[in-house]
């Protein structure tokens, strides 16, 4: 792959794996783990009002969720009745929990049959969704979950499907199609078909073709749900073609960037001044965890190394590293073993790290969509956060203006001092 593709590629998608089995080691569905988290409390009514199974309610309590978010409040009652759902809501609003809870509520596990298929565009997101299924099905011991994606051996996936067939399959379209084509994965019993970050899969024509082929292998009668943070007017009709009279929920219009509690600033500087400024800011700002976004694999490696040399505990995640290494580092950061993550766009979409309260755009994102998904890493789950963008040339300034125009926000220059209470929870 050309370096330019590596730098700019948001999507982690191997088209060729449909034809050929990828090499490398595989992993079976990991054992269930208890992970803490908390969503923003918007509605006073609790999850109990949805009349969910007691096993689900117990898991929800264990996760520390008390009240459904706005999108959960809007979607879950209809989703658990089996309605088709098309939902757009900003990052950090708990969209994943909507389809995880709705499918687990309706699931009646049958040995040897896959009932739920969830697809997304990156391996990391697939891995994370499978973890969500594991934590919410904690008290449903009969429910089996497996995750399949490229970069790991397809033989291991075939083994899992043969010997320990899951009821819920999460994966990327390329690998799912490869498994369905070679008859390892039987889609004849699918009752729930879900696309997360659906626009990313349906905008790419090759990925859309894969999704369509997989869709045609599933029964006509099934529930279809699609979710994304950005759903353009052009892509909505494409989504509807997969659905029958869907309930459409657009929790906040794409013209508004209202990430509650997120302070956004920019810093004007030359490219060669970025490191010094970054170190100064990391020295003075209070943070739980920080994500720093860069535009290329080389810059990612170099900056992470530089931070470690300056005694900042940094870890890097980029497209150039093997899949196992990437997932292991993602888990290390999530488990709070490191407080600073340097990443390429690969990490920018859909990843939930609850302690992140500062996001840096060390390099300007290529468009306003990418800006939204990057800065949404900070201030998720209704917590406060800070986003700082470095602007080093006219093109950077143009993109920042696009962001302000599109989302109708005013991003001001970083002041000399920032009130700590504006971007960090004081009670922690």
Curated annotation (Swiss-Prot):
Disulphide connectivity of cysteines: none
Compartments reported by the entry: Nucleus; Nucleus speckle; Cytoplasm
Chain positions with Phosphothreonine modification: 172
EC number: 3.6.4.13
Entry keywords, A to Z: Acetylation, ATP-binding, Cytoplasm, Helicase, Hydrolase, Isopeptide bond, mRNA processing, mRNA splicing, mRNA transport, Nucleotide-binding, Nucleus, Phosphoprotein, RNA-binding, Spliceosome, Transport, Ubl conjugation
Modified residues (Phosphoserine): 38, 41
Effect of residue 197 to A: Loss of ATPase and helicase activity
Motif Q motif: positions: 45-73
Consequence when changing residue 198 to A: No effect on ATPase activity
Catalytic activity annotation: ATP + H2O = ADP + phosphate + H(+)
GO biological process, one term: spliceosomal complex assembly
Chain positions with N6-acetyllysine modification: 36
Phenotype when changing residue 95 to A: Loss of ATPase and helicase activity
Entry-annotated residues carrying N-acetylalanine: 2
Residue ranges occupied by any Helicase ATP-binding domain in the UniProt entry: 76-249
Gene Ontology CC terms: cytoplasm; nuclear speck; nucleoplasm; nucleus; spliceosomal complex; transcription export complex; U4 snRNP; U6 snRNP
Domain notes: The helicase C-terminal domain mediates interaction with ALYREF/THOC4.
Binding partners and assembly: Homodimer, and heterodimer with DDX39A. DDX39B interacts with the THO subcomplex to form the THO-DDX39B complex which multimerizes into a 28-subunit tetrameric assembly. Component of the transcription/export (TREX) complex at least composed of ALYREF/THOC4, DDX39B, SARNP/CIP29, CHTOP and the THO subcomplex; in the complex interacts with THOC2. THOC1-THOC2-THOC3-DDX39B subcomplex is sufficient for the interaction with export factor NXF1-NXT1. TREX seems to have a dynamic structure involving ATP-dependent remodeling. (Microbial infection) Interacts with human cytomegalovirus/HHV-5 protein UL69.
Known function: Involved in nuclear export of spliced and unspliced mRNA. Component of the TREX complex which is thought to couple mRNA transcription, processing and nuclear export, and specifically associates with spliced mRNA and not with unspliced pre-mRNA. The TREX complex is recruited to spliced mRNAs by a transcription-independent mechanism, binds to mRNA upstream of the exon-junction complex (EJC) and is recruited in a splicing- and cap-dependent manner to a region near the 5' end of the mRNA where it functions in mRNA export to the cytoplasm via the TAP/NXF1 pathway. Splice factor that is required for the first ATP-dependent step in spliceosome assembly and for the interaction of U2 snRNP with the branchpoint. Has both RNA-stimulated ATP binding/hydrolysis activity and ATP-dependent RNA unwinding activity. Even with the stimulation of RNA, the ATPase activity is weak. Can only hydrolyze ATP but not other NTPs. The RNA stimulation of ATPase activity does not have a strong preference for the sequence and length of the RNA. However, ssRNA stimulates the ATPase activity much more strongly than dsRNA.
Family indicated by similarity: Belongs to the DEAD box helicase family. DECD subfamily.
Protein name per UniProt: Spliceosome RNA helicase DDX39B
